[in-house]
Amino acid sequence: VDFGVTPEQRSLANGHTGGILWFSGLSGSGKSTIAKLLQKRLFDKGYQVFVLDGDNIRKGLNRDLGFSPEDRAENLRRVGEVAALFAKAGVIVISAFISPMREDRRMVRSIAPNYFHNIHIKASLEACEKRDVKGLYAKARAGEIPEFTGISAPYEEPQNPDIVLDTENLSVQACVEQLLKYIDVQLVEPARNLEIESTQDYSGGI
């Protein structure tokens, strides 16, 4: 007897399908701020949602990794694997990482391509530096932080993201509203359709 739980059953129970919203952007672009507010809005709707970011990944799962290009790639690979497990369990995962290299983003997408949504949190380097309350950019320019994205290491913008959120011209609230609309179409509507189909099957199509 198979006592497994299907993705369709999870979607019906949760009211949405699982998904990975992969936020990519410069430090200071607004990734974590948007991620946390979006998580709150989705949680208030009763959705299964969780944020993965440097705060909860670097202190535990990836505490053995540094910031070399190789370690950064491995950091994202591990996050991608964890996000895929969450998504396959029916959770909406919001991953907020700089993810500067296209190849690394392609690698993460390849782990769970049917669940992956590439969200570019866009802001100019100048705007990000102005928002930098921790002084990270100043330290990077002084040579105190090596391989700092945007200063001494490149950021390759996504070529075909699913959404671009320009945080220089949009408020955090406006960005979240755009994401909620996107989630409704991409993750909630498929679950609604499943519910309609299951109701029709149960009623014999009446």
Label every PLM stretch briefly.
Residues R58-F67, D71, A83-R141, E147:
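ATP-dependent NMP and nucleoside kinases share a basic, alpha-helical "lid"
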